[in-house]
């Protein structure tokens, strides 16, 4: 008997802006400007790794595995710890993909988190967070020059 496997629905969202693909690419790589002030490491070089932390709830290490100026960036999650789910490492081995395409007089940014699927426990919370960071914070960084990243925590807090 063969088991039928349902296709996994990776989380994806798309925004369209007036800015050039190069401007969108630069904003994507300004991770501290739209995701978090709690980023350590290099976020704009092929092969580089950077770490993200949000309080004691979530931390990850990403390696930049694709870096094509004006077109594409891929982060491979090499380590993660999500404190509010049973499998604290459920992001390990997933990929965060930013694809940039010129469509007429607009630039389209398609964000996909490959491996962030409804079957994993953090899906609802993680989709909500990515939705904000991409559709609000990154969009505002691209179009207005200022995103809404998590602030860097003060020492001792």
Regions found by a protein language model. Give the residues of each.
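Hydrophobic ligand-binding cavity/cleft-lining segments
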Residues: 1-43
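Glycine-centered tight beta-turn/hairpin loop motif at sheet-sheet or coil-to-beta transitions
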Residues: 8, 55-57
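Hydrophobic residues positioned within well-ordered beta-strands of beta-sheet architectures
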Residues: 11-13, 96-98, 109
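Generic structural detector for well-ordered beta-strands
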Residues: 14-16, 51-53, 63, 99
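Hydrophobic pocket/interface hotspot
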Residues: 24-25, 50, 64, 75, ...
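Hydrophobic-ligand binding "helix-grip"
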Residues: 36-41, 58-105, 114-116
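Short aromatic-glycine motifs in intrinsically disordered, low-complexity regions
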Residues: 48-55, 85
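A conserved amphipathic terminal alpha-helix motif
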Residues: 115-157
